[in-house]
């Protein structure tokens, strides 16, 4: 197969969903039917091929997105298995960044759940074409048609139903293919490997005709010629329908909806056919956004094998046999083992050693990879998640990923001095793998503090520290990751002088600090940042080489705010003037001056304490609504909406994280164990003054 042609044959897809919708089982079945997995792994027995970390097998949830390559028909499918638990949305976000298409798996009983909405919104952000697989059609209470309605109501999506279920709950035995207008039935005894086509059952003829008409109405809109044909009563061919479904899926005009039961081995092969037929190849995506290093210009780069090499590192993993593995998505050009490329974000050269194609936890050595491929590189020194690897002669930086601020923190200390050094190494390794996990030192207590996206996130990282790095540690109680900010513009002129004997130090800085939301001319790339620095020095008042010292000083000192020592966020610092001394000035002197200017200037900016606000969704039977709403109000919650769902009520509220510790037990007793809840980070907001006083007193 020629290299150019090969791009058309690649499908880079993610399989994403809410926890427990059956995502890992679906991936397992795909690997089984594409011949990559010799036995079917069951998640609830702790044996799935994709869930290869020990904790994943015990908990039955997927944590790291393992990348797997398999083949179907004559196509190469690279699958990224993404986690569905809300604490791991960072994993979903970074895998979506490098995918061309996705399969969203929904639970046929529960329908669209909170995490499904989060993942859907993330996929919208990266414009990922996707299709929907309504799974668990064999379960008690499964309702395909309700699921389709929920796709419209809760996601605002335009579903295009291309299959209907045959039989319900335990009698589910196959699907109706609305393109071919045939029923596809699976033989139970053949592990789903054998299935056959037959005529649509008589009792489903009318429903199939109704949904076929809806399908045609939607797809013919995309092509005037086919629409004329359809309106004049001519038959639209299966090939024409497929071509238009592909066109509409790639342009996100609609989302094809399929159904099945991965666990019962029904519906997986047609799902694979649909991945190949309807989801885009890298050629359909066409371009990737980035910046040309030599000119600093933003550009669209074509996805092509003949262009210079450019790839994005989207995941780092520690492999027990190979060591550190960096997963990259190649957007253009090709890469050969043994060559040298440049990390354009860090401006460091990297030698390409071993290159691997991954199959869950097995690996295959390869010598060459090209545009469209997702491969793992062993032994890179300086590359972290979100970095670009590029051709040395034509350097580009691809669009970077954004990572959310952590909302929860824990103090950890090693149990023995032997653990001390190992813990430092373990934490830095884990932080390199996961950009939403941060490690810092509390300056006052000297304790090591780890920060993450939720209790489960930190629990699993501590568990990995014990298992993989053999580090025993004492763990403190979870703490809320408060932040600080300023609410008004302030200016400070500060001179740092130390000129009494010996080498002197001199630096003067004049800095304007302002809340980000009040900055009028904020650049697009700065809109999602928590701290922006700009130099407006003219005429050499501060030489160019000293300005990075000012930025570094501010970046370091903002980790310790002026109210209660929490990191300062959402502000801009502009260096507008300054002075230097020919002999006594240095980068360090300007760093010290910037820190002192921050300490002196920030109190003038009317600083406020911020706390993480969580979006909480509670699903409860009617009779407990009053008590649950009363309890959420008592937790400083603000009710956003109340909607019926089936025979239950769904309450959505914004509640400070500080008030949500231990909520699971309260909810259980309020509802006799019948209500359930989920929460995701929403935003930071000001802490009411009486609560802020208590927090300050504790510090």
Curated annotation (Swiss-Prot):
GTP binds at residues 17-24, 81-85, 135-138. It holds the Pfam family EFG_IV. Residues 8-283 form the tr-type G domain. Keywords: Cytoplasm, Elongation factor, GTP-binding, Nucleotide-binding, Protein biosynthesis. It is found in: Cytoplasm. The keyword Repressor does not apply. One of its GO terms (molecular function) is translation elongation factor activity. It comes from the Bacteria. One of its GO terms (cellular component) is cytoplasm. The keyword Nucleotide-binding applies. SUPFAM superfamilies: EF-G C-terminal domain-like, P-loop containing nucleoside triphosphate hydrolases, Ribosomal protein S5 domain 2-like, Translation proteins. GO terms for biological process: ribosome disassembly. Belongs to the TRAFAC class translation factor GTPase superfamily. Classic translation factor GTPase family. EF-G/EF-2 subfamily. Catalyzes the GTP-dependent ribosomal translocation step during translation elongation. During this step, the ribosome changes from the pre-translocational (PRE) to the post-translocational (POST) state as the newly formed A-site-bound peptidyl-tRNA and P-site-bound deacylated tRNA move to the P and E sites, respectively. Catalyzes the coordinated movement of the two tRNA molecules, the mRNA and conformational changes in the ribosome. This is Elongation factor G. It comes from Rickettsia africae (strain ESF-5). The gene is fusA.
